[in-house]
Amino acid sequence: MGNQIDAVVVSTPDHNHAPISLMAMGMNKNVYCQKPLTQYVSEAREMDKVAKERNLVTQMGIQVHSFYDYVLATELIRQGIVGKVKKVIAWSPKVWGYDGPEPEGSDPVPAHLDWDLWQGNAKKRPYKEGFYHPDNWRKIVDYGNGTLGDMGVHIFDTPYNALELGVPLTIKNNCRKPNGYGHPEKNEVTYVFPGTKYTAKKLTWIWYDGEGAPKLQKDLKLPNDEKLPEQGAMFIGEKGKRLLLPHFMELPRLIVKGKYENIDIDKYDPQGKLGEPVKDYDAESNKHYHQFVDACLGKDECSAPFSYASKLTEVIVLGTIAAQFPGKKLHWDGQNGRFKEEEANRFLSV
């Protein structure tokens, strides 16, 4: 049957992304893998390496990457609508964490579920109704990447792409102490990235998640005391201009001297190459899915291949690793893929 398959779609919990994708790529199959690409940094780098070596078509399932509002925001930032960017703040109030103890005992495994297969290479534990399958696995360290791995990937994507960032220099997560089981219910992660041509020297990036996120501050104050979008990102320029990008399917908003300022889209996209605003989620999502199919047919190129997705995923996973050392600044050696703090390196691979 293998010679009848051209591509594989991986839509499992995070911990099984890499084993399945690597097996498929080892058989020279093109792969569409859901976000985040992997659970561990070592896996992300290996998937990028194999995809390049075998010249495969790959795409990470961050469909919002292809949405008009995100494509527009990328173009606006790169054309300097707020000048050089000195800070990014991103947030989501979702709570894909669990601060309680690991449950005791076990429950009968549903007839439709192969629990051993579902657990894959992860630590083996008894099935417990309501804690893992079908939804809550995101909260558990062995299976998911918390809110960072769910919403963080989507919301990080546009600022990360627009500013052409690489991997961070330092990461610090202010959260509760690790409990060895669940991700924190609230995270406040500060990254510092090397500068690019779109940033003002080094870039500070702050992520907030959990109930009540984000922390109120001057950089997030909106005109007329308007309420912040529930989820989104703010680009802060070095001269005070700001660009708000709600998540999602809302156009970016420019803030100058405490007031909204109209964005002349024709100025930034005179030939209309970016397309038109669309208010249909399925239609917008289909662009990303179909792009992968067209790339497999040799008609297009993927905009979120593993060469890009692996780096974005690495940033996300570094934030979850920092949760193991609350309040401590970790120093990342991106070239060698290791922390200066030796005790953190054990979290880089299975």
Predicted regions and their residues:
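Alpha-helix C-terminal capping/helix-to-coil transition sites in glycosyltransferase folds
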Residues: 2-4
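N-terminal Rossmann-like NAD(P) cofactor-binding module of classical short-chain dehydrogenase/reductase
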Residues: 7-9
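N-terminal glycine-rich "phosphate-gripper" loop used for MgATP/nucleotide binding
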Residues: 12-15
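Conserved donor sugar-nucleotide recognition element shared by glycan-biosynthetic enzymes
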Residues: 17, 66-69, 285, 289
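Beta-strand-loop-alpha-helix segment that lines the small-molecule cofactor/substrate pocket
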Residues: 18-66, 80, 327
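Predominantly a Rossmann-like dinucleotide-binding segment in NAD(P)-dependent oxidoreductases
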Residues: 57-59, 64-173, 177-181, 189, ...
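C-terminal helical cap and adjacent loop that interface with cofactors, partners, or active-site loops
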Residues: 126-131, 143-163, 184-188, 195, ...
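Phosphate/diphosphate-binding loops
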Residues: 203-213, 217-222, 231-233
